[in-house]
């Protein structure tokens, strides 16, 4: 039929064809063939049945599932499977379940990175009872961990560890009196109050689009710089230069701003109606719009006293559930 895709060729970065997907008349993928460097099919996956056919050393191996295929591969390669780290209770768990350790009892780690329902998943309960594989379950989100603790029995609780995240901080906070705001709207909560109450702070406001006349009108304040159609290089420069990020735009977040500010050790302040990412902002640093003067006082305090800035950044990292290398070494 005209306009329908019947096959798609997949190339690697060097331009070599390594796979081809075929589709039926309803545009549903039916088969994927994987080629070796001689353009010979070595793996064929049937998406309708789940079967995988592998041609290895002149012999055909037929697997009824991806789990069987992965188990065969790990055993064929001779990998040590006495310790498996995985983050899914689907195929990775089923693979671990099927593997028997060579030496005693295996020691696995499951990184649980999903939300949790009103009961522990069935496969999670099975994992805790495997006779041949011991498991520790690392939960990085604190709220998910707390919910799991409310659902688990005393016997199950010992398997769970709240471990948090390791962040790659790009620099230290230098207490520069410069604040960054990135926005694609001209609605910035309490911006004129902030500009007038903080004359010694320079505000850099960037947008990846044109700016409205309302926003361009802020140029009348001496302590503001506007960047319509801001370029990536200028964004990077401002994240490196400013030590405050104000999450105050009444619209969608752009450029992953809160996380980038967090990783640059910038203190992030926001309002309740503009907060885009509570994960990277301490509760104490989220204000009611009518309480803008409290935000002003906070900014003045952290730019005046090193201890105030240090304490505020510590709260921010605690909100983001920061972990240490030592915590990871203990579980890994």
Spans of model-derived segments:
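Short hydrophobic beta-strand element within catalytic cores of glycosyltransferases
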Residues: 267-270
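Nucleotide-activated donor-binding/catalytic signature segment of Leloir-type glycosyltransferases, i.e.
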Residues: 213-230
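A charged, aromatic-enriched C-terminal amphipathic alpha-helix characteristic of glycosyltransferases
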Residues: 304-332
């Amino acid at each position: 039929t005209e306009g329908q895709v019947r096959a798609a060729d997949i190339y690697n970065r060097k331009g070599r064809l390594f796979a081809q997907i075929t589709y039926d008349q309803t545009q549903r993928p039916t088969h994927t063939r994987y080629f070796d460097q001689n353009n010979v099919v070595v793996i064929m996956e049937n998406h309708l049945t789940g079967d995988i056919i592998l041609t290895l050393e002149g012999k055909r191996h037929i697997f009824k599932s991806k789990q069987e295929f992965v188990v065969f591969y790990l055993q064929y390669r001779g990998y040590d499977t006495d310790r498996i780290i995985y983050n899914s209770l689907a195929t990775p768990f089923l693979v671990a379940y099927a593997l028997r350790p060579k030496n005693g009892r295996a020691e696995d780690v499951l990184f649980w990175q999903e939300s949790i329902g009103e009961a522990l998943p069935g496969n999670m309960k099975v994992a805790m009872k495997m006779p041949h594989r011991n498991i520790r379950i690392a939960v990085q989100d604190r709220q998910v961990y707390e919910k799991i603790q409310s659902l688990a029995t005393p016997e199950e609780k010992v398997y769970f560890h709240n471990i948090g995240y390791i962040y790659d901080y790009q620099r230290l906070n230098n207490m520069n009196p410069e604040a960054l705001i990135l926005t694609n709207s001209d609605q910035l909560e309490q911006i004129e109050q902030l500009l007038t109450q903080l004359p010694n702070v320079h505000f850099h406001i960037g947008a990846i689009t044109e700016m409205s006349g309302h926003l361009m009108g802020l140029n009348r304040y001496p302590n503001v710089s506007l960047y319509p159609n801001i370029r990536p290089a200028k964004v990077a420069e401002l994240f490196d230069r400013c030590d405050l990020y104000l999450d105050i735009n009444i619209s969608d977040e752009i450029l992953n701003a809160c996380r980038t500010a967090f990783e640059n050790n910038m203190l992030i302040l926001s309002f309740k109606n503009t907060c885009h990412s509570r994960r990277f902002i301490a509760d104490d640093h989220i204000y009611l719009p009518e309480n803008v003067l409290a935000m002003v006082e906070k900014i003045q305090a952290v730019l005046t006293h090193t201890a105030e800035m240090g304490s505020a950044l510590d709260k921010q990292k605690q909100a983001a559930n920061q972990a240490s290398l030592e915590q990871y070494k203990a579980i890994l």
